[in-house]
Amino acid sequence: MLRAVRDVNDAAVPALELVPSQAETRPWGSFWVLDEGPMYKIKRIEVKPGHRLSLQMHYHRSEHWIVVRGTAKVTRGEEVMLLSSNESTYIPPCTKHRLENPGTLPLVLIEVQNGEYLGEDDIVRFEDDYARQ
C-alpha cells in the first residue's frame, strides 16, 4: 500500500508503508534483494533522513548506485558528492565509501553489485555511527 508524503515543494511523493517481509533492517534504514545471480546482486536500499551507513570497503565486489528518490551524499575515496534522483555513481572494489541521507525524506536507491563474492561479510568498516564492527 502506498501513501503520499510531501516534499519541500509541497508535491505529493509516494512512500512505502509496508516493507517486504524479506527486507533486512539496519539502524540506518533497510534493504532487500530484488534479484541475484552468478556474480551480481541487485538491492533496493532505503536510508532514513539524517542517517548514514558506515565508512566501509569491500574486497570482492564493486557497486553501482542509482538514486531513485531523495538526495544522497556519497563519499568515494577522497571525493564527496551529492546525487539526486536519476543520478548515479560507481564504487570500485577496495575503495572506501559511505552513503548518507542529508535530506528530510527517505533516500531510495538501487544498488547493483558485481563480483566473485557478494556475501554481506565482505565488509571492512572504518567508521560506524552505530558502533558495529
Regions found by a protein language model. Name each.
Residues 99-102:
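Asparagine-centered strand-capping/turn motif at beta-strand->loop junctions
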Residues 77-96:
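Short acidic-glycine-tyrosine-enriched beta hairpin
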Residues 56-58, 97:
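Histidine-centered active-site/metal-ligand motif
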Residues 1-2, 64, 104-125:
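A short hydrophobic beta-strand segment most commonly corresponding to one strand
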Residues 59-73, 77-78:
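Glycine- and acidic-residue-biased ligand/ion/polar-headgroup-sensing regions
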Residues 21, 66, 91-92:
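Charged, often glycine-enriched C-terminal and inter-domain segments
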Residues 1-44, 48-55, 123-133:
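A short, N-terminal "cap"/entry segment at the start of jelly-roll beta-barrel domains
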